[in-house]
Amino acid sequence: MTSTFPYIFYSNCATMLFEYDGGTPFHLYLKSCFKENKNWGSKDRKRYRSACYYFWRNAFGVSRQSPEIILHWLQMHFTTAVGNQNLNIPTSNNTASNQQSQNITPTATDNLNQTVNQESNTYNPYQSVAQYLSQNITTDILTPWFIKEPLVWLSNGNITLKGLQGQLIKAGITIEQTHGNALAVSAQVNLNPWVENGNAYIQDISSQTAMNWSNQPMAAFCHANSAVWDCCSGAGGKSISLLQQFPTTNLTCSDVRSNILDNLKDRFQLLGLKKPTVFTASLNGYLDNSNSKNPNQTYNVILADVPCTGSGTWRRNPENIHFFDSQTIETFAEKQLSIIQNVVPSLAIGGYLVYLTCSVFAAENEDNIKQILDTHPNLQLVSEEFCGGIDLQGDFIYRSVIQKVN
C-alpha cells in the first residue's frame, strides 16, 4: 500500500515515540516537541497527535522496540486506519518538512514485516497485568474498550441541560451521545468556552454514574442537617455531581494539596454551587494530627475517592500502560487502606462510607474492601460494583458502599 503520508512524517513520529520515556504525560511531552518544531502547522500537529495516540492504543508489542520497527509499524497500521477512515484527520503529502530524518533510515524488509506482525498479534493492552484484574474484568473486555478513543462527557453547570445542548449545536458541535443529564462530544472539540464561563463541567459518564445517589441509601443524609465529607476531593468533580443532585448538602472537602483546593473553590463559585467547608489534611497521618482543621467530629457520609493506579482510565492516557510497573499496585493499595483506616473513626454510626477507585485491579478494589471489613467488625458491606465502563463507553469506576452499624 502507498503511504498516505510521506516518509518524513513517519520518521518524525517514530523519533518522538521512541524518545518518550514515560516520565511526563505524553500530551505535555508532545507539546514540547511541537514547540521545538515551529514549522509544523496546526494540521501537522493534528496529524502527529493522531498518529502517536493511535500507536499507543494499538502497538501493544512494539512500543519499546527500535525506531525502525516503530516507523514500520506506523507505515503498516496507521496508513491502513486512515485509508479505512477510522481516523477523522485530513490527509496530505505535504506534512511537516521535506528534509530527511537524520535518526532513522527507511526499511521495509520481510524481517521487519515479520517482527511487526508477530509482536502485534501476540499482545493485548492488559495482558501483562491480567493476573491482577478484578473479578469479572478480563482482557477480552478491556481490549476493545482501550483501543477506542473515548468521548468527552459534560454536564450543565449554571444553565439548563437543554440550554447547553442548544449552545453546542448552534456552535456546530455534534452531540455524539446522551445519558441522563450528560452529553458526549468528540475529544477533538474545544469545550473551553463553556467550561470557563461555568455553563458546563467535564466529567466522565462513569464518574457521574458512580455519583448518582438518588436511589442509594446514602441519599438520606445528603441535606443541610447531615454532614458529608469528600475526604480526597481533588478539584471537586465528585462533590460537584453531589451538589447538583442535592443542593443543600452540608459538604466538607479536604485534600493534601492546598493549591487544588483553591481550584475547587473557584469551580464551585463559577458553577453557582453552595460553598463547602474546606481544609487541608494528609490522611496518612490524620488521626495523629492533633492540630487538624477538620471542623466536624463525625460525618453521616464519607466519600473516599482514593488515589489509585488509574488503570480504569488508561485509554485516556494510553501511554501509561506501556510504562506501567505492577509493583505500584501494592503501593497504592497500602495507601488506600491507610486512608480508610484513618477516616473510619469519623464516620457516624449508621452512616455510609463510599469507596471509589478508577482502577481495574483487585488489590485496590475488592481485596481492600475485604481487609477493611475484616479489621472493622462494625462495618457492613452494602454493595459493590463497577459503574459505567464498557456499557457506557466510559471509565471503569469501582464503587463500594459500606455502612457503620455500631
Task: Give the residues covered by each predicted segment.
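S-adenosylmethionine
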Residues: 1-406
